[in-house]
Amino acid sequence: MRKFPGIANAIAAGLLLSAIFVAPAQAAPRDVTVQDTDVFPESIAATPDGTVFLGSLKKPIIYRAIPNADAKPWIHLSGNQPVTLGVLADPVAKTLWACVHEPVAAPSPTASTPPPQRSFLRGFDLETGAVKSNYPLAGATNGCNDISIAPDRSVFVTDSGNARLLRLKPGSKALEIWLEDKQNLDGIDGLNFLDGKLYVNNVRTSHIYRIPMTPDGKAGTPVDIALSQPISGPDGMRAEGGVIYIAENRGGRISALKLTGDKATVTVLKTGLQIPTGVAPMGKTLWASEAKFNYMRDPKLGNPNPFKVYAIPLP
């Protein structure tokens, strides 16, 4: 057999160079720890570069974690004892949307429930954190809970206190009541669009609904989604890759819903969480947070810290 030492040496050299210059595999995102105490985050958001945002139900602060770093205070909210529920990052509009709540009256030291709230949909610059916009919800008391962006760029908001969905059309200066349904939506919480269709959940009844939309943009009658197994206390809800991800706050679980028509197969992804309320899928990672509201209700439970956002790998 004739040998070709020059060719063999060239191949060997090429293989060696390939081994040297192959980029190392990118490390999977790690869990995020919040560098503050008593945060009690109700919602989280994420951007494609791996930045994570979260609000606080106890402090007037929105936190941010840059990729592979812990979360630190980022935005200090102005107003009357403001706190944050839903947050949503909108890279297209370069906006971080947040549901900001303020008490209507001072809390009573003997009251077992918080005072009535008024709330706002507030927009912040996604890079600097500067306030860009502020839209009050209709009514003397209300409860902005979560946010989603429609295909036409309208911003939809759930009003848990009034069983309503509100809409902010592109270019509009005010939120409008899009749907009010006390029979099905008394307890409306999370929402998201999937394949152009709007889905919402009811944290009290543990139902998922599809909200039909007429050609002229009006709301139809909610359609109850048939689930392959029960869920318990659906809260934060986000969709990506044809799947809806849900935080089950009473169930202590994170679940995935794969829809076929108006039926959904439920797959549990993570268990053992303390009142999970926020999810944010981004690429191959599902971010999920614990609110630990049980510690707010019962101080005898002790120290709730630290608060974390978990990075759950997706297939």
Q: Where on the chain are the PLM-derived regions?
A:
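A short beta-strand motif characteristic of beta-propeller blades
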Residues: P29-V34, A71-L77, A130-L137, A174-K182, ...
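Blade-level signature of beta-propeller repeat domains, shared across WD40, Kelch, NHL, RCC1
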Residues: A280-P315
